[in-house]
From Swiss-Prot:
Positions of short motif Nuclear localization signal 2 (NLS2): 184-247
E.C. no: 3.1.-.-
Keywords for this protein: Cap snatching, Endonuclease, Eukaryotic host gene expression shutoff by virus, Eukaryotic host transcription shutoff by virus, Host cytoplasm, Host gene expression shutoff by virus, Host nucleus, Host-virus interaction, Hydrolase, Inhibition of host RNA polymerase II by virus, Manganese, Metal-binding, Nuclease, Phosphoprotein
Protein's recorded name: Polymerase acidic protein
InterPro entries according to UniProt: INFV_PA (IPR037534), PA/PA-X (IPR001009), PA/PA-X_sf (IPR038372)
Cofactor: Mn(2+)
Similarity comment: Belongs to the influenza viruses PA family.
Species, as recorded: Influenza A virus (strain A/Henry/1936 H1N1)
Length: 716
């Protein structure tokens, strides 16, 4: 570093830096980063002053080197770089002549035009952090502060930058060059990390020993010590800082910070239009399972064998017919596709040896359902760029849809308990952390609360379907493979159970890129009559395929069995995330853990046991028009899990946008509730950003409706 400094800086600057370090008793052979920092600071001070003069009329003027008119008065007096005695003599002389207030600390420059002292800062960290440290140290409104960073950022008192843009650009370019030169020699990282904050001489409560070490380790990024952080917090005025930042961005930006009051926010505007429809990749609350208990058949565990065994448990099959047609589809083709599945399964049963996989015959109705040969032919751009009217497809704006009650019912159902267990205790993974006892205890309590939850069934169903579909897409790219939709669970008595929900037929799947689409037809059993909520089933063709005998209070009753058929599609990246759905368990466990931690810190002991075993205690579970809903800890666990699962099942750009933008409004409202007097600018723009995500997605519309309930009672 020392060699670099001597090569990079003017010998006069190097000499001054050496003197300064000597004066403060510092060894430049050891403190090489400090040596470089002093040289940089000196150079910036000199560049700040260079070429700036005041003419006889007292006006500021810029004169380049070698100009014959250079007999003008220098605009800036340089104080930095002089020995301390001389520097204070200059400062005293300026104060006597101009009547300026004497500063407590030695400044770097004096500006004869603006009649003020200037403190120059050069930082390797965030400019605003360094600015606030300087301001906190100086504690004088009379000294003007101007901070530069090596990334081209700057900050000055009241955003008054003193110099013209070109002069400041020259300084920024030089700093950037120094950074590049250091980086090319591998010196930058060490230099960047070595910066210490301004030291303020103030009596404070002293923290020492272990607590001091912990405090230093717990600081946010960019803070090198507890003192820096204290200085930053003490001097921070958020609204003024934001206004300053905005005015730095552009001359046109003129943001006024408006106070955010209880009367300020309005509810989100939900779209009008036909009710939204189901868009999940598989049926949720409406799914029906054909099950076998204690499976021990030949080939148990091979999906096709399991599926055939499950199909044999049902005897009420009948000639299928369409009860709810798909508005835009060729419904007879869906009917023929189901018939083909039944016929080909029958063929397998007639064979001596059941195969492990089944590829369907490529019939015309299956080709239609799977979109075979429907995609427009791709042509290389170079072959058609000369065509005059070449244009992209006109795509229609998505039709606005209104919130329908079925999505709230779906969510409520996902929070409920089933009579089966869907995960084993070790599904979340073994602990490796040192606090294993508490971690295991929390995990076991949580698992017992959610193992029977319907949302957990959706996780295991999603993992199975996505894994099977991705495997088939890679292993049988050209085939229309039949994939059973299967899940496994344990009954209350602990018996194993294999369930069949229906079938998927996969289309051609030459998936080169993550976003390339594989089409599939899903055929799922259900007892739900689609004519009760036809809007929910807009994308489906529904067949009646049999009658099922069900036990009820009045004896056995016969109910029609339906098959929900639709064409759908997914991609490698979506299947990859579908396979990772178990993460939802982890996410909701972490949310519960943070609740336990908050409770434990108040009571100053681990509250895990009390948290889960105190059945009389209720916890906030969500918002409704009535206010905050509360429930048992088990219900809280299941609700958090269901939210996480629905975020995965209904993942979409609309959800991403809504979550990111509505969070900003949520934080503002929370700040208001905490009496932090939040200020906002362009609140209308934030509402616009949130509402442009409210189009037709059922889960997003439900979340927006919940958000409105929250706004209503949060601001009472």
């Amino acid at each position: 570093m020392e060699d670099f400094v001597r090569q990079c800086f003017n010998p006069m600057i190097v000499e001054l830096a050496e003197k300064t370090m000597k004066e403060y008793g510092e060894n430049l052979k050891i403190e090489t980063n400090k040596f470089a920092a002093i040289c940089t600071h000196l150079e910036v001070c000199f560049m700040y002053s260079d070429f700036h003069f005041i003419n006889e009329q007292g006006e500021s003027t810029i004169v380049e080197l070698g100009d014959p008119n250079a007999l003008l008065k220098h605009r800036f007096e340089i104080i930095e770089g002089r020995d301390r005695t001389m520097a204070w003599t200059v400062v005293n002389s300026i104060c006597n002549t101009t009547g300026a207030e004497k500063p407590k600390f030695l400044p770097d420059l004096y500006d004869y035009k603006e009649n003020r002292f200037i403190e120059i800062g050069v930082t390797r960290r965030e400019v605003h952090i360094y600015y606030l440290e300087k301001a906190n140290k100086i504690k004088s409104e009379k000294t003007h502060i101007h901070i530069f960073s090596f990334t081209g950022e700057e900050m000055a008192t009241k955003t008054d930058y003193t110099l013209d843009e070109e002069s400041r650009a020259r300084i920024k370019t030089r700093l950037f060059t120094i950074r590049q030169e250091m980086a090319s020699r591998g010196l930058w990282d060490s230099f960047r990390q070595s910066e210490r904050g301004e030291e303020t001489i103030e009596e404070r409560f002293e923290i020492t020993g272990t607590m001091r070490k912990l405090a230093d380790q717990s600081l946010p990024p960019n803070f090198s010590s507890l003192e820096n952080f204290r200085a930053y917090v003490d001097g921070f005025e958020p609204n003024g800082y934001i206004e300053g930042k905005l005015s730095q961005m552009s001359k046109e930006v003129n943001a006024r910070i408006e106070p955010f009051l209880k009367t300020t926010p309005r509810p989100l505007r939900l779209p009008n239009g036909p009710p939204c429809s189901q868009r999940s990749k598989f049926l949720l609350m409406d799914a029906l399972k054909l099950s076998i208990e204690d499976p021990s058949h030949e080939g148990e565990g091979i999906p096709l064998y399991d599926a055939i065994k499950c199909m044999r448990t049902f005897f009420g099959w009948k000639e299928p017919n369409v009860v709810k047609p798909h508005e835009k589809g060729i419904n007879p083709n869906y009917l023929l596709s189901w018939r083909q599945v039944l016929a080909e399964l029958q063929d397998i049963e007639n064979e001596e040896k059941i195969p492990k996989t089944k590829n369907m015959k490529k019939t015309s109705h299956l080709k239609w359902a799977l979109g075979e040969n429907m995609a427009p032919e791709k042509v290389d751009f170079d072959d058609c760029k000369d065509i005059g009217d070449l244009k992209q497809y006109d795509s229609d704006e998505p039709e606005l849809r209104s919130l329908a009650s079925w999505i709230q019912n779906e969510f409520n159902k996902a929070c409920e308990l089933t009579d089966s267990s869907w995960i084993e205790l070790d599904e979340i993974g073994e602990d490796v952390a040192p606090i294993e006892h508490i971690a295991s205890m929390r995990r076991n309590y949580f698992t017992s609360e959610v193992s029977h939850c319907r949302a957990t069934e959706y996780i295991m169903k999603g993992v199975y379907i996505n894994t099977a579909l991705l495997n088939a897409s890679c292993a049988a790219m050209d085939d229309f493979q039949l994939i059973p939709m299967i899940s496994k669970c344990r009954t209350k008595e602990g018996r194993r159970k294999t369930n069949l929900y229906g079938f998927i037929i996969k289309g051609r799947s030459h998936l080169r890129n993550d976003t390339d689409v594989v089409n599939f037809v899903s055929m799922e059993f259900s007892l739900t009559b689609p004519r009760l909520e036809p809007h929910k089933w807009e994308k489906y063709c529904v067949l009646e395929i049999g009658d099922m005998l069900l036990r009820s209070a009045i004896g056995q009753v016969s109910r029609p069995m339906f098959l929900y058929v639709r064409t759908n599609g997914t991609s490698k990246i979506k299947m990859k995330w579908g396979m990772e759905m178990r993460r939802c368990l982890l996410q909701s466990l972490q949310q519960i853990e943070s609740m336990i931690e908050a409770e434990s810190s108040v009571k100053e002991k681990d509250m895990t046991k009390e948290f889960f075993e105190n059945k009389s205690e209720t916890w906030p579970i969500g918002e409704s028009p009535k206010g905050v809903e509360e429930s048992s800890i088990g219900k809280v666990c299941r609700t958090l899990l269901a939210k996480s699962v629905f975020n995965s099942l209904y993942a979409s750009p609309q959800l991403e946008g809504f979550s990111a933008e509505s969070r900003k409004l949520l934080l503002i409202v929370q700040a208001l509730r905490d009496n932090l007097e939040p200020g906002t600018f362009d609140l209308g723009g934030l509402y616009e950003a949130i509402e442009e995500c409210l189009i037709n997605d059922p889960w997003v519309l439900l979340n927006a409706s919940w958000f409105n309930s929250f706004l209503t009672h949060a601001l009472r």
